[in-house]
């Protein structure tokens, strides 16, 4: 039995859960998320907790057991607390500006780079070189943060670019002069 999959998911007060066949919908103070559970796996409610079960020990069932439990657990955390990812911009003249609900980056290109906020995502600019991506869907928050980081990845020689807060960039030694 999967170590992760066998753990029950505790449901805090103020969170509504509806189990409609393979579809799990979770509503909380921050919003609503739904997920369709893969075929052999089933989600059951017992004593104010959610239990993820698998019918057999086939390879696919074992793989999906822990995955499904983690996805449903992330949904519960998302609708109660939410998720956020902080990014930093390093480099002379590199900065970010809020334009309504969207962001506009100056990243050393000849033009500003606009980034629109997808549904369910909110941006917060703390300083011109630091901003936060907020949302209730962990996967979507990470994906948007990764796309923004990909606009100008950290340079291995000078370290310039967009990076996650606390990310350590491996630096390379430049070539030596004559």
Curated annotation (Swiss-Prot):
<dbReference type="InterPro" id="IPR020040">
    <property type="entry name" value="Ribosomal_uL6_a/b-dom"/>
</dbReference>
<protein>
    <recommendedName>
        <fullName>Large ribosomal subunit protein uL6</fullName>
    </recommendedName>
</protein>
<comment type="similarity">
    <text>Belongs to the universal ribosomal protein uL6 family.</text>
</comment>
<dbReference type="InterPro" id="IPR019906">
    <property type="entry name" value="Ribosomal_uL6_bac-type"/>
</dbReference>
<dbReference type="GO" id="GO:0022625">
    <property type="term" value="C:cytosolic large ribosomal subunit"/>
</dbReference>
<dbReference type="GO" id="GO:0003735">
    <property type="term" value="F:structural constituent of ribosome"/>
</dbReference>
<dbReference type="InterPro" id="IPR036789">
    <property type="entry name" value="Ribosomal_uL6-like_a/b-dom_sf"/>
</dbReference>
<keyword id="KW-0694">RNA-binding</keyword>
<dbReference type="InterPro" id="IPR002358">
    <property type="entry name" value="Ribosomal_uL6_CS"/>
</dbReference>
<keyword id="KW-0699">rRNA-binding</keyword>
<keyword id="KW-0689">Ribosomal protein</keyword>
<comment type="subunit">
    <text>Part of the 50S ribosomal subunit.</text>
</comment>
<dbReference type="GO" id="GO:0019843">
    <property type="term" value="F:rRNA binding"/>
</dbReference>
<keyword id="KW-0687">Ribonucleoprotein</keyword>
<dbReference type="InterPro" id="IPR000702">
    <property type="entry name" value="Ribosomal_uL6-like"/>
</dbReference>
<comment type="function">
    <text>This protein binds to the 23S rRNA, and is important in its secondary structure. It is located near the subunit interface in the base of the L7/L12 stalk, and near the tRNA binding site of the peptidyltransferase center.</text>
</comment>
<dbReference type="Pfam" id="PF00347">
    <property type="entry name" value="Ribosomal_L6"/>
</dbReference>
<dbReference type="GO" id="GO:0002181">
    <property type="term" value="P:cytoplasmic translation"/>
</dbReference>
